[in-house]
Regions:
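Helix-breaking motifs and short loop linkers at transmembrane-helix boundaries and internal kinks
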Residues: 51, 83, 104-110, 138, ...
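Juxtamembrane intracellular "pre-TM" segments in multi-pass secondary transporters
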Residues: 5-14, 198-236
């Protein structure tokens, strides 16, 4: 057998093919967020054209998350029970087409509709990608790989914010949508031909008195209990929501904040804001690496670390928006860009650790529903509404409250982690060509 055909223990594919699939998943997630977040840097240009309020501008971001909330759960069931490869490829094609359509809209209503369609396409990608990564790599490396993969979120957001402001300032905001949509089509086609893992049967095992193991198909009640009976899992979902409220607020409004507070032109404010987001390229992988190292000594590290990261982020955010100004403020925000995303790998891995392998996409979908319903979909509008009533600086100054809530939820969940882990069944994964 050739060396490059050897599948290492704990891996689903060979090393080379694992890297190829991971690269596709990384690039797809990056363009997911480029297409999703580019609109934030286009706010001043769209506002100038159509005279929109901050609340209306915020709704252009929230619309994506409303669609995700509505559809991510049913689509994740398709991912778990049908095919990761086909659903991911189809979703990427839909969100890329919708982004391209944004370049041709003629009114706020039409733009809101196309932004909603982007959310339709993106609804099941994160659950699908998370399930693929959980299957491809050993459990011991799950946080680290999740950290690397989730680094595509700030990278895509930063590229979207930076490119949006630059393209709009030179060629108009419509061109920004059209240009960033094209790569997603190419990646969608490539993923249609990727390998997948065999769909996992929903089987429950029970040890009998004679030592034999009885296997039976899960009932609807068994499926429901697989989630609701685990406090650590439930608290992780809500901790995600509180953190995502803060990160979405910053992704949406930070460039506009620099523009309004410091009178910096958007073509300069956008790259300045994007650098804060780009530092999450350090935060997410670093958080995953540290979490997995800590987990060797502390089994519940995948929730302890997010809790501590949220506490530190709360302090930095308070200093940035309530104490510091100018250079001191920007330095604090750069540190925040690292710390605030370091929670993601551990929390994302926890949603996979604590559930039957046949429900991995569904588990992360529930995390997305909760975080988008209570966090991402609310944040742009809430911050925009407070900004309309007061000012943008006052609106962003409330963010530490949400970080303290997140810390409380994660640290409480850590208390139940070991017990909940002991109830999860191990199921070997097989390749589907």
């Amino acid at each position: 057998m050739k060396k490059n055909k050897v599948v290492k223990p704990g891996y689903l594919f060979t090393t080379g093919y694992t890297n190829y699939v991971f690269s596709l998943l990384f690039l797809l997630y990056m363009f997911d967020y480029i297409d999703r977040m580019i609109v934030g840097s286009l706010f001043p240009f769209i506002k100038a054209d159509w005279g929109l309020t901050d609340t209306q501008l915020g709704s252009l971001v929230s619309a994506v998350y409303w669609a995700i909330v509505a559809l991510t759960f049913p689509i994740s069931i398709l991912v778990d029970r049908w095919s990761r490869r086909r659903t991911i490829g189809a979703m990427a094609a839909v969100w890329s087409l919708a982004t391209f359509a944004c370049a041709f809209v003629g009114s706020f209503g039409q733009l809101l509709a196309t932004r909603t369609l982007i959310g339709v396409g993106e609804a099941g990608y994160a659950p699908g990608g998370t399930a693929m990564i959980s299957a491809m790599y050993p459990k011991e490396k799950r946080s680290w790989i999740m950290g690397l993969w989730n680094a595509s979120i700030p990278l895509g957001s930063a590229i979207g914010v930076a490119l949006g402001g630059i393209i709009a300032a030179n060629w108009g905001w419509r061109h920004a949508f059209g240009i960033v949509a094209i790569p997603g089509f190419i990646l969608a086609i490539l993923f249609f031909f990727a390998k997948d893992y065999r769909t996992v049967d929903l089987i429950k095992q029970k040890e009998l008195e004679d030592g034999k193991v009885e296997k039976k198909k899960m009932s609807a009640r068994d499926m429901f209990n697989e989630f609701i009976s685990k406090p650590a899992l439930m608290l992780t979902y809500f901790g995600f929501a509180a953190m995502v409220f803060v990160t979405t607020s910053l992704l949406t409004w930070l460039a506009t904040y620099f523009n309004r507070i410091y009178d910096i032109p958007m073509e300069k404010a956008s790259p300045k804001a994007s650098l804060v987001m780009l530092l999450a390229l350090v935060g997410a992988p670093l958080g995953g690496y540290l979490t997995d190292r800590w987990r060797k000594r502390q089994v519940n590290a995948r929730l302890l670390f997010p809790g501590l990261a949220a506490l530190v982020a709360a302090g930095i955010t308070f200093l940035a928006f309530s104490v510091f100004t100018g250079t001191e403020q920007y330095i604090a925000l750069l540190f925040l860009g690292i710390v605030i995303t370091s929670f993601i790998p551990g929390a994302a891995a926890a949603t996979q650790d604590l559930i039957h392998p046949g429900f991995r996409a569904t588990s992360y979908a529930l995390a997305i529903v909760v975080q988008n319903l209570l966090g991402a979909s609310m944040a742009p509008i809430v911050i925009g509404w407070i900004s309309d009533k007061t000012d943008l600086g006052t609106a962003l100054a409330i963010l530490p409250i949400f970080l303290l809530v997140a810390a409380t939820l994660f640290l409480t969940g850590a208390m139940f982690y070991k017990r909940d882990m002991s109830t999860v069944e191990e199921v070997p994964m097989e390749v589907r060509h």
